[in-house]
Amino acid sequence: MRPAADITLGGRYTLTERIAIGGMGEVWKARDKVLGRIVAVKILKEEYTGDPGFLERFRAEARNTALLNHPGVANVFDYGEEDNSAYLVMELVPGSPLSSIIEREGTLPPDRVLNFIAQTARALAAAHSQGLVHRDVKPGNLIITPDDRVKVTDFGIARLANQVPLTATGQV
């Protein structure tokens, strides 16, 4: 299935607009018809759904992120597979990636940067306390809300500290 506006996944999540395109898939804004809320739906690229390794990484992202309950981590609500597609339903975080803010504003004031670092560290500490290692912390994976709260996103290559990694050393 190729994602498009007005497609409904799982009989529940109606896609409304594409928010972003990444290496493993697309993120869409969607309406949850059951709960009446707006969510983000990350859809794995079709070319990867036939690859058991990629599909397992995507499932692992859903499982691993769902373990977390912290205000600095975007919540995962659901996961599904249908019509040769896999998707992850999560909190739609208002705001912009830190990478976009840096592009737009240039050098940020040190106190603001320190605030972002402290919030990110707290969110990662919560992940680490549950044995989850993010492995891809970068400005593009930190969403900054309008009131300067940080939400860590994209645990796509995260792993549980006690598990064998799904990627070989040196691969992303």
Task: Kindly label every feature range from the protein language model.
Residues 31-38:
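Conserved N-lobe loop of protein kinases adjacent to the ATP-binding glycine-rich P-loop
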Residues 116-117:
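Activation segment signature within eukaryotic-like protein kinase domains
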Residues 43-67:
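AlphaC helix of the eukaryotic protein kinase fold
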Residues 15-22, 27:
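Protein kinase glycine-rich loop
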Residues 79:
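Activation-segment/catalytic-loop signature of the eukaryotic protein kinase fold
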Residues 83-97, 101:
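Conserved short submotifs of the Hanks-type protein kinase catalytic core
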